[in-house]
């Protein structure tokens, strides 16, 4: 019953209106697993390669028919008659078939879609939810926890076309007692922020990840608006809600001057100066998490940032580590950052994703499961966060169904687990105890 009889690839549309890859894995007996691959817009240079057609006669060159063809021919032929329950073997077959270090032959978008579709098919064979199947192949059967969300409510950077440099301004509902309550808190603050922006005559248009994208006087102005929305929602800054940011600093790093240019500040910063800029923000606002605070290759700058803030707040590597064991191990060896963003399409298979999560946990790095700016209705990352007890999830705002689908999946999982739905909330944030005791009372 676990034997693969057919693998199908197709081109579908993602949340930005661009093509992406969807795959189906068909098993003997009629079981079908279906999954799709997301796509980023601010892409780390070390990410696994996403194969695009680059044929300008269709979809502005963004088509994925080459990746789909790889699924329908090479991948399908190599997986026929294989056992879907052996996820590691399935993924290794595709990795070997690709034959490159960054999956540039078949494409990480093709391999990941099939990898996830296979896991879904395997879970159906066992008649268990995907998160339970993931916990089993992760060798942590029966161990689950609900993630604390990072809820994106203001978009900047490459996720929209406003004048804000920092890519994501997020809230974390640390006062919540369940994922359902955390989502409620995020929704209320999101809608109150929209009302405040409207009252001030600011744009309430939304960016790629569902957050508002107004033009602001400065990056700091975003925090002021969010604080106002939190208070209007009758929550307390520091006690109920803390902040998180994704700088995506590689996007405003200028190679020619080797400096960081913030257009909203109209100023250039050296690595050291930008570290001090971030440090000051954490002193002025309850920021418990900073992602990609420096350029992906600015290891020296990241080392400085870690020295200043690494024992106080959560420092997350996204472009820095790209869900890659090699770069995570290097960061661990050098004592850089203390957390990692987990994006399955950065590495290109479920097996490799689980490997990176294990390494991070072994060395005390927090893990945050993440979406991409180009998403679909696929909710696999919700199951991944629960099945690996990763502790935190980053899946956008309280608008756009490609984002809310993941939140809704988490609500259903929590309901299904009942009294076994463990939600650690605030405790999942790296170094939150140290920071909370010394700083949050000031806000």
From Swiss-Prot:
Cofactor, free-text remark: Binds a second Mg(2+) ion via substrate during catalysis.
Biochemical pathway: Carbohydrate degradation; glycolysis; pyruvate from D-glyceraldehyde 3-phosphate: step 4/5
Record InterPro entries: Enolase, Enolase-like_C_sf, Enolase-like_N, Enolase_C, Enolase_CS, Enolase_N
SUPFAM superfamilies listed in its UniProt record: Enolase C-terminal domain-like, Enolase N-terminal domain-like
Pfam families in the record: Enolase_C, Enolase_N
Annotated residues for binding of Mg(2+): 246, 291, 318
Keyword ATP-binding assigned: no
Keywords: Cytoplasm, Glycolysis, Lyase, Magnesium, Metal-binding, Secreted
Localization per Swiss-Prot or TrEMBL: Cytoplasm; Secreted; Cell surface
Binding site for (2R)-2-phosphoglycerate: 167, 343, 372-373, 394
Any single GO CC term annotated in Swiss-Prot or TrEMBL for this entry: cell surface
Active site, per annotation: 209 (proton donor), 343 (proton acceptor)
UniProt catalytic activity: (2R)-2-phosphoglycerate = phosphoenolpyruvate + H2O
EC number: 4.2.1.11
Cofactor: Mg(2+)
Matches recorded under Gene3D superfamilies: Enolase-like C-terminal domain, Enolase-like, N-terminal domain
Quaternary structure and interacting proteins, as annotated: Component of the RNA degradosome, a multiprotein complex involved in RNA processing and mRNA degradation.
Function: Catalyzes the reversible conversion of 2-phosphoglycerate (2-PG) into phosphoenolpyruvate (PEP). It is essential for the degradation of carbohydrates via glycolysis.
Family: Belongs to the enolase family.
Protein name listed in UniProt: Enolase
């Amino acid at each position: 019953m676990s034997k693969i009889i057919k693998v199908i690839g197709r081109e579908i549309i993602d949340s930005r209106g661009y093509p992406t890859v969807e795959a189906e894995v068909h098993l003997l007996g009629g079981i079908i697993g279906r999954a799709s691959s997301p796509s980023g817009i601010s892409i780390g240079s070390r990410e696994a390669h996403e194969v695009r057609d680059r044929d300008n006669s269709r979809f502005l060159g963004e088509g994925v028919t080459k990746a789909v063809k790889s699924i329908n021919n090479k991948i399908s032929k190599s997986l026929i008659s294989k056992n879907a329950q052996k996820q590691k073997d399935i993924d290794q077959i595709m990795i070997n078939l690709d034959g490159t270090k960054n999956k540039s032959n078949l494409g990480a978008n093709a391999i990941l879609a099939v990898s996830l579709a296979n896991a879904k098919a395997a879970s159906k064979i066992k008649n268990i939810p995907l998160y339970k199947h993931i916990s089993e192949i992760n060798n942590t059967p029966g161990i689950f926890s609900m993630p604390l969300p990072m809820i994106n409510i203001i978009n900047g950077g490459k996720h929209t076309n406003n004048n804000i440099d920092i890519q994501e301004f997020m809230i974390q509902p640390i006062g919540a007692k369940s994922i359902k309550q955390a989502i409620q808190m995020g929704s209320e603050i999101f809608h109150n922020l929209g009302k405040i922006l409207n009252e001030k005559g600011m744009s309430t248009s939304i960016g790629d990840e569902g957050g508002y994208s107004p033009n602001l006087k400065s990056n700091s102005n975003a925090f002021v608006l969010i604080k106002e929305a939190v208070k209007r929602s009758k929550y307390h800054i520091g006690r109920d809600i803390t902040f998180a940011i994704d700088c995506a600093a590689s996007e405003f790093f200028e190679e020619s001057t080797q400096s960081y240019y913030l257009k909203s500040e109209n100023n250039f910063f050296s690595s050291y100066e930008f570290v001090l800029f971030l440090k000051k923000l954490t002193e002025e606002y309850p920021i418990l998490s900073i992602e990609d605070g420096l350029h992906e290759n600015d290891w020296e700058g990241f080392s400085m940032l870690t020295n200043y803030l690494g024992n106080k707040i959560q420092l997350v590597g996204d472009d820095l580590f790209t869900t890659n064991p090699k770069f995570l191990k290097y960061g661990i060896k050098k004592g850089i950052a203390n957390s990692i963003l987990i994006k399955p399409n950065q590495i290109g298979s479920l097996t490799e994703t689980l490997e990176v999560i294990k390494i991070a946990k072994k060395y005390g790095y927090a893990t945050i499961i993440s979406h991409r700016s180009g998403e679909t209705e696929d909710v696999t990352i919700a199951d991944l966060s629960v099945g690996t007890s990763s502790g935190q999830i980053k899946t956008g705002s309280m608008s756009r169904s490609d984002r809310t689908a993941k939140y809704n999946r988490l609500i259903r999982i929590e309901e299904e687990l009942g009294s076994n739905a463990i939600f650690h909330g605030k405790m999942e944030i790296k170094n939150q105890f140290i920071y909370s005791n010394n700083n949050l009372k000031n806000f």
